[in-house]
Amino acid sequence: MSLKAIVFDRVLGKCSVKILDQLLLPYQTQYLTINTIDDGYRSIKSMQVRGAPAIAIVGVLSTLMECQLLLQESFVKTQSFYDLTQLEKILNERLDLLLSSRPTAVNLSNAITDLRKLISNDIGKTYNSLFQYACDIIDHDYADNFTMGENGAKHLLAQLEKEAFEGDFGVLTICNTGSLATSGYGTALGVIRSLYERTKKQISGDEQPKRTKTSNAKMVRVFPLETRPYNQGSRLTAYELLHDEIPSTLITDSSISYLVSTSKIPIKAAFVGADRIVKNGDTANKIGTYQLSIVCRHFGIKFYVVAPTTTFDSNTETGDKIVVEERPPNEFRFVQGTLIDGTDPTPVLNESKTPVKAKVGITPLDMPVWNPSFDITPYTHIDGIITEKGVFAKDENGNFHLETAFQ
């Protein structure tokens, strides 16, 4: 099992980039080489790589790798569309292509805006600038994820202490927001990881410094939603939770209310990621997030969005202005996965001993379908937005003030 979504060998002038093909998980681990912007575009568009932070990183790295090829005169001679005297113009056009791969995730848009400021007709200068930016975006994302994890864990435990809650509790999450969606550790799943680290210390009897102990509450189980129709919860989040040995139970998207009402341990919070957060706090995230927020609101469960400030959109006032990507209808009509033996529940292997992929139809081919990739959760349903800069809470009038997130 591998949780390394992006492998970047950062040697100036000799960089290499590989990404984990997440369409093959959880039964097969295979890495794809990224050499050009076209490679980056295809891997993002096809969802071989997904998660707003990871999409941005792969976009940046694919641009870096294409510029690294342009340092080679032999490569330039094979490219009819590349005239190095027009490098800045051509690269901007290439970035337009990259941007079209996933329009809802703002991290990619923000990163491309930064890249446009770094490119010029000087290929050497452009490459060096892109190399430094690529290193920085990966390092900052990784560090920010740990910070968000700690911020979120401390905040929830402090809230539970205010409620005088003690004992075991569970949390909900949707889609995949962990190492596979970022440079490592994760956003919403990073908070869950940090919560469970505290639980393990309490169970083992390890003493915590008084200044960090905020509650006797213990998160003892995670309930990830399967996240139809692409099943990021069942394929990817379940994979990460098993890897980290975090107690968890996978549930169907339609069973949330029944789970909450019958669970033997109280469900105290839901942690979700974000692909775009606008100025009033409205949040675009994986389809199904909005309905999860409605369930949490009904049952009085805290609902938190976890995202780095690179996910904030300073140009959009409210969520109704967000462009929501619609995926191809056949991604809904068909289910793709690893072929399982009908008599023995193990993967069927081909001649090279790798699992066989299969696609199964689940609805009439001529049935019209609606397949939005995201929905918009209104800020009124969100109790807090957890970032690397801290936790944004609402004022007494129920409004967020996110100005510092945009600085």
UniProtKB/Swiss-Prot annotation:
It is found in: Cytoplasm; Nucleus. The active site is at residue 275. GO terms for biological process: L-methionine salvage from methylthioadenosine. The keyword NAD does not apply. The keyword RNA-binding does not apply. GO terms for cellular component: cytoplasm; nucleus. It is an enzyme of class 5 (isomerase). One of its GO terms (molecular function) is S-methyl-5-thioribose-1-phosphate isomerase activity. Keywords: Amino-acid biosynthesis, Cytoplasm, Isomerase, Methionine biosynthesis, Nucleus. The record marks 175 as: Transition state stabilizer. It comes from the Eukaryota. It catalyses: 5-(methylsulfanyl)-alpha-D-ribose 1-phosphate = 5-(methylsulfanyl)-D-ribulose 1-phosphate. Its main location: cytoplasm. Pathway: Amino-acid biosynthesis; L-methionine biosynthesis via salvage pathway; L-methionine from S-methyl-5-thio-alpha-D-ribose 1-phosphate: step 1/6. Belongs to the eIF-2B alpha/beta/delta subunits family. MtnA subfamily. This is Methylthioribose-1-phosphate isomerase. The lineage of its organism: Eukaryota, Fungi, Dikarya, Ascomycota, Saccharomycotina. The gene is MRI1.
